[in-house]
């Protein structure tokens, strides 16, 4: 039978004692309490020892009780002064009592019949009575003395003198449960103990042991790597935040430039008009977007850019006939929380880009929706675009698939034809979630020339807008999008780290 060093030492000492209190066994072995308890439990599992436990309710002194045991109960201190002087005022009592003790003790002296109370010249006077002169030790005094002598006394013993609730009421004593442990050797333990050879175990192989050759003489401690241990929850990043940081880092490593963002609020010009989305499009109504009550309107960019966008809408650019309506600058000036990250792509293109160039942003967007496990009204979106001479639709599909497979960990991805006012051709990307089935991630396409030429770009631009929250559901293995922003401590502790 294989025993650790602590188990061997504990068994040898227990064989000498046969039966001992746990504290006695700790003293005999010279080991720490934790080490002895681990050894006893190990010996018990091997049938070599038995651990007996008996729980009992006891009473011990509080800090207030310890003070009273040393200087006396307040009523006895007050009575001693009364016996010396015959009668006292409240100011006199303050010589021996604290302000907290004064009021209740005056009432107690009166209740016990140890003093009479009267008013004289506007002052409260206490005068000792015959009963006060003859007062003797009471049950509470004997209980206090017993607790001071023994430190810990069983409840049943205290109850013979006074109810424990009375000690609690006066904050003299407190009740707790203590467990007395006794360890006993078994016949199998008695048989094995004389045969045990006690060798000091070594838990670390040091250079000195190797050089001296003493490693041949020592016994190495065995470790059970499967033994259960206390779980530790070290500090870590919020899981979703860690995922976003990983995405950002990965895109930068791939050569993308992160677009800077000034505000969550945009004009409809950047949300829609600059993207060649007509002002009568249903997606611009209150059912699909939020609007600001105050301030209601913002400012349009430089006049030349506004004029090109207006022309694209009314008459068309790059061979297009446009949307054929009268474009309203007042409508374009209306303010709203950003409805999609593509608004930032439009801003960046108008500001100027490197050609070829790759750009991205991870931003909060807002849309009216019904909250459920796959929809939020405020969520994060990753938008990006690549601009270059030779770009085509196949490049776009390759980038999207790489996103879903490599970054989100999706196993199956599919693309469906779609329609967006500002891209042509357009595509919708979905990935398969083991719990939710096919989940839409977002849309993508090649920006229409009516949009890019109005913004001053003459080469192809492939772009996408992806719900990064849904990508995170795959990577973090959750089936409810609301968990990404959860305060659930258990989920925050146990959610896997994303690298």
Swiss-Prot record:
Localization of this protein: Cytoplasm
Names of the cofactor(s): Mg(2+)
A single Gene Ontology CC term: cytoplasm
GO biological process: phenylalanyl-tRNA aminoacylation
Catalytic activity of the protein: tRNA(Phe) + L-phenylalanine + ATP = L-phenylalanyl-tRNA(Phe) + AMP + diphosphate + H(+)
A GO molecular-function descriptor: ATP binding
Stated family: Belongs to the class-II aminoacyl-tRNA synthetase family. Phe-tRNA synthetase alpha subunit type 2 subfamily.
Protein name, per record: Phenylalanine--tRNA ligase alpha subunit
Organism from which the protein derives: Thermococcus gammatolerans (strain DSM 15229 / JCM 11827 / EJ3)
Gene it is expressed from: pheS
